[in-house]
Amino acid sequence: MTTLGTPLSPSATRVLLLGSGELGKEVAIELQRFGVEVIAADRYANAPAMQVAHRSHVLDMLDPIALRTLIANERPHLIVPEIEAIHTEALVALEREQGQKVIPTARAARLTMDREGIRRLAAETLGLPTSPYRFVDTVEEYRDAIAAVGLPCVVKPVMSSSGKGQSTLRSEADIDAAWEYAQTGGRAGAGRCIVEGFIDFDYEITLLTVRHAGGTSYCDPIGHWQQDGDYRESWQPQPMSAAALRRSQQIAKAITDDLGGRGLFGVELFVKGDEVWFSEVSPRPHDTGLVTLVSQELSEFALHARAILGLPVGAQDGGVIRQAGPSASCALLAHGNGVPAFDNVAEALRDPDTALRLFGKPRVDGHRRVGVTLARADSVDAAREKARVAAAALTIQLQA
């Protein structure tokens, strides 16, 4: 797609975002820079991407009839899934029956909507190294799986994100509570889970991998710190050996080549010395990649927009995306119930090498990521400290 129309006209190039969170918001902004007509959909009103889209829709995207009706009415040129909780079989059928273009492909959306599809592809079809694992449906299978993979281990619903339903089991005392949380915390309610054995790794990375008209390109590796299964900080570049980086790129290319299509993929990997293990992949921008808003000339969102529109992504020789220097991000979390408001914004931005993104989440119930601070410095450690200081300066209030 190299001819782009004018939004809100008969020539418009229309893109439908399925999921309208903070990552979708940044994708929508990048698409609008190219005059794309953006339609945002999600299960709740006033989601972040809806605030910058040409129009929006609220629906249950796990309902195939509602999803098909939306697509029939909007007639998008591209469908861009931004979350996992979508009736992907409907997308597969539409791609097969009507030639509907799903990014990167409907098959990729289906395989990555839950952990089972992508883990079986990576480990059993492609033979990529992974942690030991078992899939379970019942509490009896769950206990057998723990016995098989050993403690410590991790249990996750096959369909969840941002750490929801995920627990780390370090002793037998954790077993019952972890099962209960896995059955209540996933996106699709009670059901199938994965039990994963621990890997003794040095660090985790996200390798942002872009499939585009000119081939496959890679961003510098992103290191990250998680708590309760959810991203708290990320930084770029993550130092690693040349051998580990080559192996990471080989694994990323193997999985993204199999998934196919065009767009940006977030490939999560465990690294120990020169050894690398595949963890997960998202066929869309990744939350740890928010750091690229300041660390790269083209952010992960700009790269995704360019790739899906068939435009050059500005890769250097060797397929590496240009990086702007050591950078870091720190997530802003709100706890409680209400509509978020932010104080001390000027203080948070006092350092000229810091930036701030407030997502526009309409409400917090419990705990929610509502923004991110970003920083550049002469080293990754200094950038991380700047991002933390900026985050600590902000005060988040929840208003009734």
Swiss-Prot record:
N(1)-(5-phospho-beta-D-ribosyl)glycinamide binds at E22, L23, E82, D287, K361, R368, R369. PROSITE patterns: ATP_GRASP. The keyword rRNA-binding does not apply. The gene is purT. It comes from Xanthomonas axonopodis pv. citri (strain 306). One of its GO terms (biological process) is 'de novo' IMP biosynthetic process. This is Formate-dependent phosphoribosylglycinamide formyltransferase. The keyword Cell inner membrane does not apply. GO terms for cellular component: cytosol. Residues 120-309 form the ATP-grasp domain.
